[in-house]
Amino acid sequence: MTCSVTSFFTASALGVGNAETLANYRLGRAPGMKELAGDIPGRSIWFGSVPGELPEIAERDQDMRSNRLLKLAVESEPAFAALVAKYGADRVGIVLGASNTGIDEAEGFVDAWIETGAKPEKMDFSMIELGTPALYLKGLLGAKGPVYTVSTACSSATKAFGAARRLIAAGICDAVVTGGVDGRCRFAMNGFQALGALSPGSKPTSRRLLRHIQSQAQTPVGIQDVSLSRHGVARR
């Protein structure tokens, strides 16, 4: 059995959409890279965010950056919804990789709770459940096959692809929408800071990297905000 990638969408610091991402990559340009202060006490860091505005979400308990990215992907690439029409809702699964989904929003709510002494009205604990992004995408597409999130830190999205292929190989699904979606949060930033894994100049492939992080060239995978790739993996 052979699986093939039939469609995909990406949004990152390089831009929104496949064409813009490729064009900026070729030019060596990343419009979403900015120096930010406040996440880590006493220092600023270079960080990659998706440039531009993201679609709004009316549902209070679903309104977080990772879900807005998923909505952007579905609105930008109709081929994902077409998988459900082609194979039937019961034969389309969803497997996403995510680690920090909803954490940034939760941090803001907790700060407000501590400051005011009252739980914020918009705060919903389901926002930090790891399964939330996959369930939200299920609602957007109307898929009724297996739906879950893989959360194994930086390897999450890669493992999601493997899980998607196994669902197809086992005959459980004819198509799976898979990939990775995540957002920035202080929790993750301070974790990488504690490991000494953040480069002051944010040049992961430069020969001028500080010695203690030369062996961690892939570290920026962990510090790139809202890196997202949606792929429809279909059975031939």
Task: Please state what every model-predicted region is.
Residues 163:
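Internal active-site segments that recognize and position negatively charged phosphoryl groups
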Residues 180-181:
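Short secondary-structure boundary segments
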Residues 167-168:
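Hydrophobic pocket-lining residues that define ligand/cofactor binding sites across diverse proteins
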Residues 1-146, 185, 191-236:
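Conserved "HGTGT" condensation-loop signature of ketosynthase/thiolase-family condensing enzymes
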Residues 157:
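Short conserved active-site loop signatures built around small residues
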Residues 160:
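Active-site histidine-anchored catalytic micro-motif
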Residues 126, 150-153:
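Glycine- and other small-residue-rich loops at beta-strand/loop junctions that grip anionic moieties
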